[in-house]
Swiss-Prot record:
The keyword DNA-binding does not apply. Its EC number is 2.7.-.-. InterPro entries: Stealth, Stealth_CR1, Stealth_CR2, Stealth_CR3, Stealth_CR4. This is Capsular polysaccharide phosphotransferase SacB. It comes from Neisseria meningitidis serogroup A. Part of a capsular biosynthesis operon and has been suggested to be the polymerase that links individual UDP-N-acetyl-D-mannosamine monomers. In serotype A the capsule is composed of repeated units of (alpha 1-6)-linked N-acetyl-D-mannosamine-1-phosphate. Non-polar disruption of this open reading frame prevented capsule synthesis. GO terms for molecular function: transferase activity, transferring phosphorus-containing groups. Stealth proteins are part of a protein family that is conserved from bacteria to higher eukaryotes. Family members were first identified in microbes as proteins that help pathogens to elude the host innate immune system. Microbial stealth proteins are involved in the biosynthesis of exopolysaccharides. Stealth proteins are predicted to function as hexose-1-phosphoryltransferases. It comes from the Bacteria. Keywords: Exopolysaccharide synthesis, Transferase. One of its GO terms (biological process) is polysaccharide biosynthetic process. The gene is sacB. Belongs to the stealth family.
Amino acid sequence: MFILNNRKWRKLKRDPSAFFRDSKFNFLRYFSAKKFAKNFKNSSHIHKTNISKAQSNISSTLKENRKQDMLIPINFFNFEYIVKKLNNQNAIGVYILPSNLTLKPALCILESHKEDFLNKFLLTISSENLKLQYKFNGQIKNPKSVNEIWTDLFSIAHVDMKLSTDRTLSSSISQFWFRLEFCKEDKDFILFSTANRYSRKLWKHSIKNNQLFKEGIRNYSEISSLPYEEDHNFDIDLVFTWVNSEDKNWQELYKKYKPDFNSDATSTSRFLSRDELKFALRSWEMSGSFIRKIFIVSNCAPPAWLDLNNPKIQWVYHEEIMPQSALPTFSSHAIETSLHHIPGISNYFIYSNDDFLLTKPLNKDNFFYSNGIAKLRLEAWGNVNGECTEGEPDYLNGARNANTLLEKEFKKFTTKLHTHSPQSMRTDILFEMEKKYPEEFNRTLHNKFRSLDDIAVTGYLYHHYALLSGRALQSSDKTELVQQNHDFKKKLNNVVTLTKERNFDKLPLSVCINDGADSHLNEEWNVQVIKFLETLFPLPSSFEK
């Protein structure tokens, strides 16, 4: 796969014609459907007229592409892309998006529109230089001619299709599967060929006012003007906490306030930056586009590459959410007592560290139920018990202190930490806890480094408080933690392999590249982490200058 470095990317944005003239993408100027069209000369089939029409359309498109002299790269190649292109061709039908984006979406066409749709579909995949495969008689088929496609598709009611392209700059976004269905019409209803989450039988009197199956490729959920009960009609924001240990002002403050003793709470590896934030944002743009706004909480200057003019990005300094008496702070526990004070934040938000990276397509349902109940990803095993002890991990002591509050409130004991993964949070619950435990919040807020008497608000207290009060449930999503004391090379390579295979069932929801214990001094660890980040997320996001 051809990957653009920064110099080539700048050239592409500055002068696309020169880029394509000089680059490996030059082959796209000559539309590969020319060879494909040679195989379309099968005129003896019963659908001879329609096949000829398809061939004629493809030939015309080929000539038009030659006039344009190039096909532009595709930034995001997905089901939405093909729906948009089909709408440009005035195709007619409906589409159904699954609640879980790792499942296949469906494109549903009336039987009476089949011939017209197939002409427009073949024209679209030809003009876009896309490769078509589909499952037929239990095997994945690579059709060699329009005749073959028409013969196959006219004999079945539905088919799983795969579209792929060489026009993306990353192999992880170069293909997708969807289901093509042909619906039968009765005088009173339309019958879909397979069941779906809305309704398999669509009564015609229910579509009088919404023009479904009348114009364009429309979302099937438009059978009502109201949101569907499984859909989320609330905004979700994203919050990062970020620090740059190379920031000069931060370094001066750190030297001034750093205690004489060393611990994991003061280790510089905790504050090391490899531009993980850049890659985390790339992963969210690729896999979590449902996010409304991204808040980045920091006491450092924004990185030079970050585009603060992007309307989705808002930089939040500590003094905007924390009192002056608590500043400066170098404690994540302290910062996490105040995230719900971010101005303008939605009641529903996802809290993520910059070392948490998404690995597959996600939507709101991965983090919240449609009724607002949060989804937690607690570890499968318990780890929290006993009393706070000097010298033991600060995250564990923070959880122990939180556990004491939970036991008093709910008369139950808890033991499970949250996995190293994005956390589903609600500001109303955080405000409620702050009001209920003012002394513990205030004490943690004013500790400049993680301390023995901290409470872990987002690391422990929130999740179990929400769970025990009926406002959160455990999720079955898998996550991956990678540390230098693991077989990290094997773990990272496995994620890369599964991503290339688009094996969403086995891919974790996220992977955490977890620094600590002076991991920044481990050269092999640093090399493998950087290689992983650049391999999985090579393309700049819209959040970069």
